[in-house]
């Protein structure tokens, strides 16, 4: 299983092709393709490449699924004995991003197809009868 560590929105996220992730708001419309070039690490078949600070020639392609808002975080400030209280809420804007592929040195790493996974999961009838 191939994966990469990218930096987006001031955070580092471990991403795999075929999965979706909630990241900081991107200025892209839903169903729009985005390319992330700030790749810090790429792992493919046990071979790990670490960038200093970025991996040269590595990009991550994804599709914006939708924009949403995160859970509400409540901030409560109070001064004792003064009857001063402030209660504020904040909801972070989030983009749900589906990772399509990871490109590294001209090699495109994508998610395994569903037909290959089901073929591996199907029990062999000859060995099951024994």
Curated annotation (Swiss-Prot):
GO terms for biological process: translation. InterPro entries: bL21-like, bL21-like_sf, Ribosomal_bL21, Ribosomal_bL21_CS. Keywords: Ribonucleoprotein, Ribosomal protein, RNA-binding, rRNA-binding. The keyword Cell wall biogenesis/degradation does not apply. Pfam families: Ribosomal_L21p. One of its GO terms (molecular function) is structural constituent of ribosome. One of its GO terms (cellular component) is cytoplasm. The keyword Chloroplast does not apply. It comes from the Bacteria. This protein binds to 23S rRNA in the presence of protein L20. Belongs to the bacterial ribosomal protein bL21 family. Part of the 50S ribosomal subunit. Contacts protein L20. This is Large ribosomal subunit protein bL21. It comes from Trichormus variabilis (strain ATCC 29413 / PCC 7937). The lineage of its organism: Bacteria, Bacillati, Cyanobacteriota, Cyanophyceae, Nostocales.
């Amino acid at each position: 299983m191939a994966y990469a560590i990218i930096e987006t929105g001031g955070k580092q996220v471990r991403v795999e092709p075929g999965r979706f992730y909630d990241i900081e708001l991107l200025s892209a419309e839903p169903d729009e393709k985005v390319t992330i070039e700030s790749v810090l690490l790429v792992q493919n078949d046990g071979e790990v490449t670490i960038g200093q600070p970025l991996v040269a020639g590595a990009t991550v392609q994804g599709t914006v699924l939708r924009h949403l808002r995160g859970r509400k975080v409540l901030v409560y400030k109070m001064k004792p004995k003064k009857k001063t209280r402030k209660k504020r809420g904040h909801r972070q804007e989030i983009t749900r991003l589906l990772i399509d592929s990871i490109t590294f040195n001209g090699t495109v790493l994508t998610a395994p197809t569903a037909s290959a996974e089901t073929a591996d999961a199907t029990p062999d009838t000859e060995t099951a009868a024994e």
